[in-house]
């Protein structure tokens, strides 16, 4: 085998490895293709409870033209100013043009549990999908049932304002680093939570309520330091108290 042929084989192998890794990282995650959003009253009622318990209104409340807010409407627009840019909470009413009116069950599962849009792009972690990763599918679908039962509101929110280097593609590396350095909140079930009551509390605090998104410190890349879960944090000029 001549040297040129050997180099080509090595190059071909390296390209194949890179493509395989890219496929693994960028391909939208698999979810239950048989899942459906229910329209019955019980599912909607459970979804309403979950949306309230999860504090969704805190970010997704409507922002009126005069700057006032309306927590009774989830049409979004609230600006979250962070060290990584300004992020605007989206419209989560069932408006087809500016909201989630055309979302299917699989879209809710990929968004909440994997941080991926219906088109497959990555959501910025201002949306706490790493906490929501631990939600069970039934709860996610009930949340979808409730949101799709709301009155649609046409409200196009502003585009996120991020530095030039922070693209959605960069989130591939960010998510990988977060997995390697801290894991996901859904994996933090300890021996202290053996009782069903404590397991339920952990589920509400770590996952649905995503308390750690504010109360757990982060490193310079914005990755939660889960070894210090609920130990308090500094967000901008605000000091978030410890709740551990």
Could you tell me what each predicted segment is?
Residues 47, 53-63, 108, 143, ...:
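The canonical Cys-X-X-Cys-His
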């Amino acid at each position: 085998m001549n040297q040129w042929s050997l180099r080509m084989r090595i190059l071909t192998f390296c390209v194949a490895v890179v493509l395989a890794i890219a496929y693994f990282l960028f391909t939208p995650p698999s979810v239950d293709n048989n899942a459906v959003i229910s329209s019955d009253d019980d599912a909607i009622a459970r979804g309403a409870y979950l949306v309230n318990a999860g504090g969704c209104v805190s970010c997704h409340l409507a922002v009126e033209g005069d700057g006032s807010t309306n927590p009774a409407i989830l049409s979004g627009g609230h600006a979250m100013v962070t060290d990584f840019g300004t992020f605007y909470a989206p419209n989560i009413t069932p408006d087809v043009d500016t909201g989630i009116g055309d979302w299917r069950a699989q879209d809710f599962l990929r968004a909440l549990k994997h941080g991926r849009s219906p088109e497959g792009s990555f959501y910025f972690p201002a949306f706490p999908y790493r906490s929501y990763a631990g939600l069970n599918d039934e709860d996610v679908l009930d949340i979808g049932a409730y949101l799709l039962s709301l009155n649609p509101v046409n409200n196009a929110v502003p585009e996120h304002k991020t530095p030039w280097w922070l693209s959605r593609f960069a989130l591939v590396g960010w998510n990988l680093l977060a997995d390697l350095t801290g894991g996901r909140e859904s994996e933090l079930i300890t021996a202290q939570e053996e009782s069903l009551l404590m397991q339920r509390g952990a589920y509400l605090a770590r996952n649905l309520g995503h308390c750690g998104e504010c109360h757990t410190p982060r490193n310079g890349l914005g990755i939660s330091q889960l070894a210090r879960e609920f130990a308090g944090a500094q967000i901008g000029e605000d000091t978030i108290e410890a709740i551990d």
